[in-house]
């Protein structure tokens, strides 16, 4: 149990700092309210419930579909983000893992490369 005391102290200090920061900001900071500050923010798009027009395309109203290129870009980001999540711990502990882990990572990287090549050949990386 004595091993975890520094971690618990650090967690308590982090939580206390967060609470104190929020309390001080709410007491000292300006509190000018207006309608645009209270509205929901949906990635630069007007909220779907207002029926207002958006800036995604000419004449596009909220609730309509938007170009698939945004979806593809987000999915590619997630794929490569997850790749890094798996690649970093493997690289850190590579010395102790051996050849089997090298083969596993090579297969994983090959799979990601094939997916990348597929998206590239299908035109998912062009913004026309």
From Swiss-Prot:
Reactions catalysed, as given in the entry: a quinone + NADH + 5 H(+)(in) = a quinol + NAD(+) + 4 H(+)(out)
Location in or out of the cell: Cell membrane
Membrane-crossing segments per the record: 5-25, 72-92, 100-120
Keyword terms of this UniProt record: Cell membrane, Membrane, NAD, Quinone, Translocase, Transmembrane, Transmembrane helix, Transport
One CC-aspect GO term: NADH dehydrogenase complex
Topology within the bilayer: Multi-pass membrane protein
Gene Ontology MF terms in the entry: NADH dehydrogenase (ubiquinone) activity; NADH:ubiquinone reductase (non-electrogenic) activity; quinone binding
Enzyme class label: translocase
InterPro entries found in the cross-reference section: NAD(P)H_OxRDtase_bac/plastid, NADH_UbQ/plastoQ_OxRdtase_su3, NDAH_ubi_oxred_su3_sf
E.C. numbers: 7.1.1.-
Subunit structure: NDH-1 is composed of 14 different subunits. Subunits NuoA, H, J, K, L, M, N constitute the membrane sector of the complex.
PANTHER family for the chain: NADH-QUINONE OXIDOREDUCTASE SUBUNIT A, NADH-UBIQUINONE OXIDOREDUCTASE CHAIN 3
Family: Belongs to the complex I subunit 3 family.
Function per UniProt: NDH-1 shuttles electrons from NADH, via FMN and iron-sulfur (Fe-S) centers, to quinones in the respiratory chain. The immediate electron acceptor for the enzyme in this species is believed to be a menaquinone. Couples the redox reaction to proton translocation (for every two electrons transferred, four hydrogen ions are translocated across the cytoplasmic membrane), and thus conserves the redox energy in a proton gradient.
Protein name as it appears in the record: NADH-quinone oxidoreductase subunit A
